[in-house]
Amino acid sequence: DCLYLNIWSPRDHSSFNAEKLPVMVWIHGGGNTIGTANTYDASLLAGSEQVVVVTINYRLGFFGWMSHPALRTPDRNALDASGNYANLDMIAALQWVSDNIANFGGDQNSVTIFGESAGGRNVFSLMASPLAKGLFHRAIAQSGSVGTAPRWRAENFHDDTQPGQALSSREWLSLQLKNSGRAKDSKAARAAQMLMSDEETRDFMYSRSPQEILEGVSGGAGMYSAPQSFRDGTVLPQDTLYTVFSDPSRYNSVPLITGTNRDEAKLFLAQDPEFVELRFGFLPRVKDLQAYNELSAYLTDSWKAMAVDGIADIIAANSSEPVFAYRWDWDEGGKSWLIDYSELLGAAHGLEVAYIFGGFDGAIGAPGLYTDNNIAGRDLLGQQMRSYWSEFASTGAPGNGRSGVLPQWRPWSNAGANLMLLDTASGGGLRMVNEPMTVAMLKERIAQDPNIPELRSRCALHVQLFLLANAGDDVWDEADYDALGCAEFNPWGLEVER
């Protein structure tokens, strides 16, 4: 019972006004397994920028995505068989907005979808979905990713020749059979489910309570790595999004803003005891700052290479619709003898969201991150970002912002500065730069990095960046992997080891 949405409309704008306002539909993040629209207060964004903001909920994790042969038998319709139930929730929300938003002063012909992290991933998926055609007119992906999953990755056992994810539907079903007492161990559960008919499998799945469905599933901050965004051929194309976005006739080609944060990975590394220890049980300290920064740079740069430069290059080369790219660089978190947030987090994943919505109290953070010393810079940067975002929602280009006084944000091109850096004056301010990051550059860096002494470690990093993270298998090239000297290591075997 989660399919609700929230609407913020400027107080001084009546639904009876002849001029309707741009609409911004927010898709929350959380790995597509946690989170809620109710976390986000869009009153400042709506009121200060004169836009109507809608925040939506959708089914999460196994409830939102479940791909299994028993769920797509011939008697099932294509939507039920897709397994992409959460994507369908988002499309239903957009249809509701199209049908009803005029009653709240919004223009159904000027709808911008925007989301962060998993929400950004969902933005890219909606761009690719033929079922979302005409329901939105602009898109913003904040720290998104373009990864989609083939059926085998979502369904196979983890040790199959084509290995499924650790929580593929068959692995999850084995867990359910063990938890219910119908199998004593994984081997017995595997044998049992292979003997079950499609009807028996469905009946068993449907009999499990929400609590039972999640029993034994764990992950950081409540998140877990469930398969999602399946290439089903109905809700999402059967090709990778890199392939789809190469042809504007195959997706919802609209103006796009895409960007990442300069230190994305530090949010996750900061919670990993391999890299960060807790003094007195609560004060984090980076164990090896050089190693911490180097791994963060690899993970973060691969994110930018795939979700910003890679996507922008493909769309700019093939579509007449503009792409605008950014990198968010704010790293002025509080510093004391106890903790230095500029080192621990820097410009970490998710921190930019508070600047869009304008509230820092409930933002990702920790005591001492936001201080009186950095409040003036934070507030101004937030105003500037909201101005750019709302101008894009209004016109399809961030330009000089809604205020008309900001540095011009130019579209992506292969010549000159094409990336907007978003930072306070003490960090250099708002400015256009040319700082490319490509998959080829990263592969060469791994090959030449003197700080990776072991071949196996080099190969494992290659697998982590180009097979498992962000873009899924969009950029995987077996020949490149072999050329690195990794042919002796099964890449999926390296995944299992981690």
Model segments located where?
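Mobile gating loops/cap/lid regions near enzyme active sites that modulate substrate access
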Residues: 313, 317-498
